[in-house]
């Protein structure tokens, strides 16, 4: 085996050959030519042809090497690389091994340690900030310098902040556990040390795993609001945030509840028929009623700001966003409105085409989607209000629908739920399990939650439902049974479901703050009741 010095000697000899060729093309001194070494070619096993000659004296070798280096330095980088590649291609595999051993430490440098030495700590921190939790744990064990960069760069804090920005579950936990006050602060403000965030991360992971297990197993804490309607009983619609729940009732009223205490804060009256649908934002509440009107209320004062009279029969559903509102009615029509302000709302277009009551609408910047008792879902262009396509498949009227991105999920009085690709109109999956009309449905990135006239709420695995290979028996994760009447409306997030029913109650199913009670046969497991009557 050649050692490294022998390999370098061989390279210099090949360079000498190259010089000889250069000299052969020019006028040469006869005496110099006579002293040229005699070269013979030998074949090395498993390698290319290599030159073999008697080693020149040290003096000649040094001179020849210096000449080669001078010529090499005069070439461009591309020519240098090409020349070295040519030399390497003429070597044997064991010579390649020697060169690899020589180059390896040059190529595998600890740049994380080297950067701070050059005053570039921020670059080292930025590089390591892209690591996930497992890789960050490993990086801490590399050496003390890496551990110092991670600690002083507060990289565990940055990792948690990145998760909070991109994952709704992390964001919700940060708000509920109040450790968001330690996030998104610069280094000049007083923040805990890196060790605080290092220990916080596994606690968050444990919380997330517990919440996911609670959803799968149906473990929840249950709170119940008894609405105590005076005349007609039933809660037709609701929406909630962290502070309040706003509900529309069969007795024509709108009730606003404190989310924490479950106390009724305010009752809005004005409709002369049942409040069938509602939506609110930070400024207004918009409601639709069986009295055929749409009313706009100030969300803080409860004052009526506007009343829209257009539909000839009950307003069954409405949605508004970014200055656009869409309403639908038992009169079979869909109305598209421009909302310049709460008091300046004008009718843009009326969409007709359904042959029965239009029960639900949803929209985004691309499509308006409507579903009807005529068993069809129709798709319209949001910008032009022109008809695009019809989705056919349900065997009876469609009662509920949600649309987001390319996915439409609908529920019908044929007791099924269907998933659709809105772009091609294909039905992707049929979910079966409810025993009566599916009245309300919502989905997020993980789950579909449905409520039906059978009084049951079902939680479905969305990703499995979108996988055609998944068996139908694996799709329904849990059935929740607490309502004693038809489920009219529900909304959910990562931590809870809030539902309303014909039984005049609003139920809050909390999957975050769960007691340790055991399961009860035939009912939803792990329930703790809070009864509020107002």
UniProtKB/Swiss-Prot annotation:
Its main location: cytoplasm. The keyword Nucleus applies. GO terms for biological process: protein ubiquitination; sprouting angiogenesis; Wnt signaling pathway. Pathway: Protein modification; protein ubiquitination. GO terms for molecular function: protein dimerization activity. Disulfide bonds: none annotated. Keywords: Cytoplasm, Nucleus, Repeat, Ubl conjugation pathway, WD repeat, Wnt signaling pathway. It is found in: Cytoplasm; Nucleus. PANTHER family: F-BOX AND WD REPEAT DOMAIN-CONTAINING 11-B, WD40 REPEAT PF20. The N-terminal D domain mediates homodimerization. Self-associates. Component of the SCF(FBXW11) complex. This is F-box and WD repeat domain-containing 11-B. It comes from Danio rerio. The lineage of its organism: Eukaryota, Metazoa, Chordata, Craniata, Vertebrata. The gene is fbxw11b.
């Amino acid at each position: 085996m050649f050692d490294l010095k022998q390999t370098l000697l061989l390279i210099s000899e090949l360079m000498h050959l190259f010089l000889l060729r250069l000299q052969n093309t020019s006028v040469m001194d006869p005496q110099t030519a006579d002293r040229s070494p005699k070269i013979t070619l030998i074949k090395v096993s498993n390698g290319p042809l290599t030159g073999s000659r008697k080693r020149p004296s040290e003096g000649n070798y040094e001179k020849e090497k210096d000449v080669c280096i001078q010529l090499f330095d005069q070439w461009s980088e591309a020519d240098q690389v090409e020349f070295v590649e040519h030399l390497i291609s003429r070597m044997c595999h064991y010579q390649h091994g020697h060169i690899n051993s020589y180059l390896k430490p040059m190529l595998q440098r600890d740049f994380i340690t080297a950067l701070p030495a050059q005053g570039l700590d921020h670059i080292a921190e930025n590089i390591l900030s892209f690591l996930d939790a497992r890789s960050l744990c490993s990086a801490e064990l590399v050496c003390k310098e890496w551990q110092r960069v991670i600690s002083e760069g507060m990289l565990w804090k940055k990792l948690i902040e990145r998760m909070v920005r991109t994952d709704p579950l992390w964001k919700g936990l940060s708000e509920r556990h109040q450790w968001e006050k330690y996030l998104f602060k610069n280094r000049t403000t007083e923040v805990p040390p890196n060790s605080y965030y290092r220990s916080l991360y596994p606690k968050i992971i444990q919380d997330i795993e517990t919440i996911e297990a609670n959803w799968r197993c149906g473990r929840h804490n249950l709170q119940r609001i008894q609405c105590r309607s005076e005349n007609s009983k039933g809660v037709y619609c609701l929406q909630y945030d962290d502070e309040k729940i706003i509900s529309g009732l069969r007795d024509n009223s709108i009730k606003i509840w404190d989310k924490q205490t479950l106390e009724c804060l305010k009752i809005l009256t004005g409709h002369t028929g049942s409040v069938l649908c509602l939506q609110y934002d930070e400024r207004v509440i918009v409601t639709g009623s069986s009295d055929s009107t749409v009313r706009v209320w100030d969300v803080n004062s409860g004052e009526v700001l506007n009343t829209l009279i257009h539909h000839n029969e009950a307003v069954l559903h409405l949605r508004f966003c970014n200055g656009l509102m869409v309403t639908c009615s038992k009169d079979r029509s869909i109305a598209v409105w421009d909302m310049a302000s709460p008091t300046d709302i004008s009718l843009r277009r009326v969409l007709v085409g359904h042959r029965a009551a239009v029960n639900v609408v949803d929209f985004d910047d691309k499509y308006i989607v409507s579903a009807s008792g005529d068993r069809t879902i129709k798709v319209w262009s949001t910008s032009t209000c022109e008809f695009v396509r019809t989705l056919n498949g349900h065997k009876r009227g469609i009662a509920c629908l949600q649309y987001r991105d390319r996915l439409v999920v609908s529920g019908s009085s044929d007791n099924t739920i269907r998933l659709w690709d809105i772009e091609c109109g294909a039905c992707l999956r049929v979910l079966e399990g409810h025993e009566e009309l599916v009245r309300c449905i919502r989905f997020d990135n993980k789950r579909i939650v449905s409520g039906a006239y059978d009084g049951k709420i079902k939680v479905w695995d969305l990703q499995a439902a979108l996988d055609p290979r998944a068996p139908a028996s694996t799709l329904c994760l849990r059935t929740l049974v607490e309502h004693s009447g038809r489920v009219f409306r529900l909304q959910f997030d990562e931590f809870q479901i809030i539902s309303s029913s014909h039984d005049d109650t609003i139920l809050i199913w909390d999957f975050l703050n769960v007691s340790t009670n055991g399961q009860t046969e035939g009912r939803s497991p792990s329930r703790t009741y809070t009864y509020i009557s107002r």
